[in-house]
């Protein structure tokens, strides 16, 4: 059983100073300025002295077809010298003059007491005479350029579009891994990672993650020596690599010569690669034009972009000089401050042991 739509009462106070309509004549005979038309569960029609709060005051010069438009509310009235018709339902077979509403703050007498009230004032021009037939047939298709008549009527077409939309496959990706990763993050990193995840939709976020891992880091695995400019297969360069490994080692006992079968040791740790990956995924506008690069044991930079307070563990720590724009590896450990610097068109992330100004 369909539930009937709730009907709200509308109060229209017709002000016809010339007394050319039935409303104006009744008000004049009763020595009152207004004629009230109440539309709701019941219909009332009477002359009144003043409008009620939240009522519509319709000022008309004479007979006409008026349509009051107040947001979603539409009230259609036919005012003639001998009759009145009004409705809040659809009434499309006649032409109407659209009348806009202006809310006003006023003081009116209501139930014998002067109160502050809001009324809605609208003024008609009488340019549309009552009962002028609307020549537009809703069932007739007009001749429009580039438009052809459909084989469906409007209801069937809407239902067809709705069924197609509901039957279309929806890609739903549920990722649990990122939430598991956030359990092992520091509080500030987990908050930043969560905000970045909310800004990027699910499917787009996965694509960005794959792109960051494949393109930005170029399939880098922990343990690979990034000092490519210094790498050579000659015996002299092997001795230099061996001395550099001794400098970077935390343990003084790791002074043995590296054999040809072993991979060369490096200061780039797995934790560092993971932390940098998460920073790149944040898509900071200050870094968008720069490509990611790994720092060497020592080197230079062009400018300091920003310094962030982040707690990182088991990462290479650097001492960098802002005046000479040089940095140098000190050890592998924990830090609470990270510097973002640029070299040419590359972004380098340095964990700060301390710095010289």
Curated annotation (Swiss-Prot):
Residues 163-199, 228-267 are annotated as: Disordered. The keyword RNA-binding applies. Residues 230-241, 250-260 have a biased composition (Acidic residues). GO terms for molecular function: RNA binding. InterPro entries: BTV_NS2 (IPR007602), NS2_N (IPR037194). The keyword RNA-binding applies. Pfam families: BTV_NS2. Keywords: RNA-binding. Belongs to the orbivirus non-structural protein NS2 family. Single-stranded RNA-binding protein. This is Non-structural protein NS2. It comes from Bluetongue virus 10. The gene is Segment-8.
């Amino acid at each position: 059983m369909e539930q009937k739509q709730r009907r709200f009462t509308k109060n229209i106070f017709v002000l016809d100073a010339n007394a050319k309509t039935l409303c104006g004549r009744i008000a004049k005979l009763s020595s009152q300025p207004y004629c009230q038309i109440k539309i709701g569960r019941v219909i009332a029609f009477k002359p009144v002295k003043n409008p009620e709060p939240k009522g519509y005051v319709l000022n008309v010069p004479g007979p006409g077809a008026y349509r009051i438009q107040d947001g979603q509310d539409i009230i259609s009235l036919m005012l003639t010298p001998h009759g009145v018709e009004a409705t809040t339902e659809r009434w499309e077979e006649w032409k109407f003059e659209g009348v806009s509403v202006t809310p006003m703050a006023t003081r009116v007498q209501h139930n014998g007491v002067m109160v502050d009230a809001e009324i809605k004032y609208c003024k008609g021009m009488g340019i549309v005479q009552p009962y002028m037939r609307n020549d537009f047939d809703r069932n007739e298709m007009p001749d429009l350029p580039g438009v052809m008549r459909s084989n469906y009527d409007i209801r069937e077409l809407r239902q067809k579009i709705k069924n197609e939309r509901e039957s279309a496959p929806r890609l739903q990706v549920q990722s649990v891994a990122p939430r598991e990763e956030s359990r092992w993050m520091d509080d500030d990193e987990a908050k930043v990672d969560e905000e970045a995840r909310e800004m990027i939709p699910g499917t787009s976020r996965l694509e960005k993650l794959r792109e960051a891992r494949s393109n930005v880091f170029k399939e880098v695995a922990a343990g690979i020596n990034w000092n490519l400019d210094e790498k050579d297969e000659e015996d002299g360069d092997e001795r230099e690599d061996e001395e550099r490994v001794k400098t970077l080692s935390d343990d003084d006992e790791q002074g043995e010569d590296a054999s040809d079968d072993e991979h060369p040791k490096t200061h780039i740790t797995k934790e560092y690669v993971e932390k940098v990956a998460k920073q790149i995924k944040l898509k900071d506008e200050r870094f968008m034009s720069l490509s990611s690069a790994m720092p060497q044991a020592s080197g230079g930079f062009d400018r300091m972009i920003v310094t962030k307070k982040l707690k990182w563990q088991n990462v290479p720590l650097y001492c960098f000089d802002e005046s000479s724009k040089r940095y140098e590896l000190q050890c592998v450990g924990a830090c609470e401050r990270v510097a973002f610097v640029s070299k040419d068109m590359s972004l380098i992330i340095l964990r700060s042991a301390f710095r010289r100004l």
